[in-house]
Regions:
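Pre-Walker A (pre-P-loop) alpha-helix and adjacent loop at the N terminus of AAA/AAA+ ATPase modules
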Residues: 10-54, 242
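Conserved C-terminal "switch" segment of AAA+ ATPases
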Residues: 7-15, 28, 168, 182-254, ...
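Conserved alpha-helical scaffold flanking the Walker A/P-loop in AAA+ ATPase domains
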Residues: 38-41, 95-117
């Protein structure tokens, strides 16, 4: 077969495997298919995800299930104000050998895993958050002056409660930008909640089964980068990201009046990756404008902010992103 035909065959095989993974995940994490898609998107793209939702919506259950299905060694850290960097990274202890000699031995922290759940990440101090920041970006940690490799794959799925703000330390823009997507976990509808009730209060609960190995996940991440992206989609991504920069020439008056700062180049990179994953999860061989529209809010909402006047008026950042993206897609379709 020719190389394009080989690529098509590989993508189709991966799409089938992803559908198996989704089916296994949704046996334990019922409903909320969009949440499952976005977390899988983060893993396929080799990135990290920030899950925002109220307690009791199944975020921890989702991460545990993902760990099983994707064949990843997972750890969980409950972030608190007194959590120190050493509690995450690990530390060196002084050991005494049988002959009386002493030497330092490194005890690795919970960050040395393949899928880390950082629960209530905004409750940790900025000092502890910065330790996680290095790990997320560089996939290495520095302990006692020595760099230690975390290896691949390494993914952080962090959770945050949008309501409780007392005793929290808001994540700085630099750290928010390290998350590939923001996943809003909302209340289930009535039928989904009924299904959850019946599935989780009986004698037996459904079990998730491993579908991927970590080697297969790494191969999928490489394959995703080989998926072709049309020129019109590339231009739409650039138009969308630049449309939210208030100082950019030609942006709308609404953006100038409401946006404090817009997304940087990393947002365009994130869109370029996530539209491919979104297309793959929906069984298509290449992304289109609809993928850009679907990924606009998860990719951009944590990479920009409304100004004080807009927040005082009660303006919605999500509405701004979705309406602007929809307008650009309509313009592109009419061209």
């Amino acid at each position: 077969m020719s190389e394009p035909a080989d690529l098509v065959s590989e993508i189709e095989a991966l799409e089938n495997k992803l559908q198996e993974a989704k089916s296994s995940i949704t046996r334990r994490f019922i409903g909320q298919e969009r949440v499952v898609d976005l977390t899988l998107t983060a893993l396929l793209c080799g990135g990290h995800a920030l899950l925002i939702g109220l307690p009791g919506l199944g975020k921890t259950r989702l991460v545990e299930t993902l760990s099983t299905v994707m064949g990843l060694h997972g750890n969980r850290i409950q972030f608190t104000p007194d959590l120190m960097p050493a509690d995450i990274l690990g530390s060196e202890v002084l050991d005494t050998a049988e002959d009386g000699s002493r030497h330092f031995r490194f005890i690795s922290g919970p960050i040395f895993c393949e899928l880390l759940m950082a629960d209530e990440i905004n409750r940790a101090s900025p000092r502890t958050q910065s330790a996680l920041l290095q790990a997320m970006q560089e996939r290495t940690v520095t302990v006692a002056g020595e760099d230690r490799d975390l290896g691949v794959p390494f993914h952080v799925l962090a959770t945050q409660n949008p309501i409780e703000q007392e005793g929290t330390y808001p994540l700085p823009e630099a750290q928010l930008d390290r998350f590939l997507v923001q996943v809003d976990v909302e209340y289930p509808d009535r039928q989904t909640e009924r299904d959850i009730l019946l599935a989780t209060t009986g004698v037996e609960e459904a079990e998730a089964h491993q579908i991927f190995t970590k080697e297969e996940l790494l191969a999928a991440q490489v394959l995703l980068r080989r998926m072709p992206v049309g020129e019109s989609v590339v231009e739409l991504i650039l138009d969308l990201v630049r449309a939210f920069r208030p100082d950019e020439a030609g942006v709308s008056e609404r953006v100038k009046e409401t946006v404090a700062w817009g997304p940087g180049p990393r947002a365009a990179q994130a869109l370029m990756m996530t539209v491919r994953a979104n297309a793959m999860l929906q069984g298509r061989l290449a992304p289109n404008a609809e993928d850009v529209l679907e990924m606009a809010r998860p990719v951009l909402s944590h990479r920009m902010a409304l100004n004080f006047a807009a927040r005082a008026r009660g303006d919605s950042l999500s509405d701004l992103i979705e309406s602007t993206a929809a307008g650009l897609v309509r313009t592109e379709a009419a061209a």
